[in-house]
């Protein structure tokens, strides 16, 4: 156990991107959490805590974090490293990154950054069919958005984990990928470490020892959002070779370009599971991350201690709400937290929210809030990635759709900027999306969570509250040119009118 007295005006970030909306933590914070799954959205984890005063905590193993009575307690039976003297949040991050998760010079594919991504989930749910997917793709093109990465989400296969049998939903996957390629899309398909626990294929991999067994030595059947299933033992090299063989077949014979690797959270594993290579439940997520990292077209939601690596890290499925836990208000702080944990190539979930309601004709529970959808698009527009799912052309009024389209196009216009920042991240470890405190320390910006810095020279200040048409914007020292062409002297706070069709952003004048 390590106890650290929190300094005056000291703020802390870390451990779990899904709790970013609660950050930063300070001397008045009363919270305790482990590295187990976060019911508010697991997202990405790292055994790392960073301070605005240039201090940090690192451990090679999971730990429990407690902030109480002005003291930070790190509870673990393993070694804990406590470092001081890095001066700032940025200094602490860079020191920890260089020592413990240096970036490897690799990035996901450029297309993730230079074009919007599209996902079939909110349109089709688990009813993924050839006709439905092609109709969705054609609508994207017909509505002037242009091609990009297209992800065929969960439910496209007949049985989880087995891709080539009883293909009634998509009887000819090669035909489907060929048609999508003709439209200009790159095609990813949903995969996971979960396998259906019935049938000939299941019996084969069971008998080969590819599945996790519980403490009693029986095949572990775990509950998840689609029922009960077995789980692959990815600590076994033979299991990994089999899975990669399946992926290779999907790529070479069926035209798939890459994979959305879902699930893999700690909740699928137990510390006392019988594995080929014993490890803690939390660490199995790392092995899952290793599985997909070599594919340039990849996407993960669950990650552990994988900072510095070339994976797309998506935020947990968001609700269509203004909330701070799983709504629009979590986007900026959680994305900032991702970057501080070493996950630079981050995607802020689907515009409007990716938590599906299968009872709704439009995939979203309740009525569509057009103001929310617009503000969500604006909040994502100048982040490094944007992912669309539900077709805004069919759920919004003409006026709202035109505003949304404007900011989708703005995202495309900044594609080369995003790509340059991704390449920079791969070499320096610097996040693409940064907090004001990270980039401009010493100005009292620690608790600002409704604006962010793109790279080092663009401040973005979206609206994330319903009915807000005026907002304050903090501008640091220097000269700043607004989206409306107005130049401001920095080291000030300005008040801006923000009608529904405006996103405030400011470029530093060189």
Predicted regions located by residue number:
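Catalytic-domain carbohydrate-binding cleft regions of carbohydrate-active enzymes
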Residues: 2-507
């Amino acid at each position: 156990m390590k106890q650290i007295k929190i300094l005056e005006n000291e703020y802390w970030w870390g451990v779990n991107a899904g709790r970013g909306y609660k950050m930063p933590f300070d001397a008045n914070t009363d919270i305790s959490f482990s590295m187990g799954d976060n019911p508010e959205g697991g997202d990405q984890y790292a055994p790392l805590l960073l301070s605005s005063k240039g201090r940090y905590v690192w451990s090679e193993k999971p730990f429990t974090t407690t902030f109480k009575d002005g003291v930070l307690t790190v509870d673990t039976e393993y070694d804990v490293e406590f470092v001081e003297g890095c001066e700032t949040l940025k200094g602490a991050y860079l020191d920890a990154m260089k020592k413990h998760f240096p970036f490897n010079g690799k990035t996901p594919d450029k297309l993730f950054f230079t074009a919007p991504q599209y996902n079939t989930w909110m349109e089709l749910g688990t009813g993924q069919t050839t006709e439905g997917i092609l109709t969705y793709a054609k609508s994207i093109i017909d509505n002037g958005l242009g091609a990009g990465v297209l992800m065929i989400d969960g439910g496209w296969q007949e049985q989880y984990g087995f891709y080539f049998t009883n293909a009634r939903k998509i009887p000819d996957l090669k035909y489907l990928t060929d048609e999508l390629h003709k439209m200009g899309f790159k095609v990813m398909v949903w995969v996971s470490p979960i396998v259906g626990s019935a049938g000939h294929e299941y019996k084969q991999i069971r008998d080969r020892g590819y599945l996790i067994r519980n403490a009693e030595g029986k095949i572990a059947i775990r509950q998840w959002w689609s029922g009960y299933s077995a789980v692959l033992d990815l600590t076994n090299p033979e299991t990994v070779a089999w899975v990669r063989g399946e992926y290779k077949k999907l790529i070479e014979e069926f035209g798939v370009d890459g994979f959305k690797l879902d699930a893999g959270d700690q909740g699928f594993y137990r510390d006392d599971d019988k594995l080929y290579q014993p490890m803690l439940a939390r660490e199995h997520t790392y092995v899952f991350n290793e599985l997909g990292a070599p594919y340039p077209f990849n996407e993960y939601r669950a990650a552990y201690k994988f900072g510095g690596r070339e994976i797309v890290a998506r935020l947990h499925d968001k609700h269509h709400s203004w909330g701070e836990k799983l709504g629009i208000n979590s986007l900026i702080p959680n994305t900032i937290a991702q970057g501080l944990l070493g996950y630079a190539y981050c995607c802020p979930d689907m515009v409007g929210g990716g938590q599906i309601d299968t009872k709704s004709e439009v995939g979203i529970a309740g009525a569509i809030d057009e103001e929310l959808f617009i503000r969500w698009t604006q909040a994502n527009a100048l982040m490094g990635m944007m992912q669309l799912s539900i077709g805004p052309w069919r759920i919004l009024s003409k006026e709202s759709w035109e505003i949304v389209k404007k900011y989708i196009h703005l995202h495309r216009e900044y594609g080369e900027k995003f790509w340059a920042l991704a390449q920079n991240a791969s070499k320096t470890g610097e996040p693409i999306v940064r907090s004001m405190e990270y980039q401009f320390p010493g100005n009292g910006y620690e608790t600002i969570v409704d604006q962010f810095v793109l790279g080092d020279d663009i401040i973005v200040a979206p609206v994330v509250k319903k009915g807000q048409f005026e907002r304050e914007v903090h501008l640091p020292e220097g000269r700043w040119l607004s989206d409306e062409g107005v130049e401001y002297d920095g080291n000030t706070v300005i008040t801006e009118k923000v009608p529904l069709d405006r996103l405030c952003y400011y470029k530093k004048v060189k």
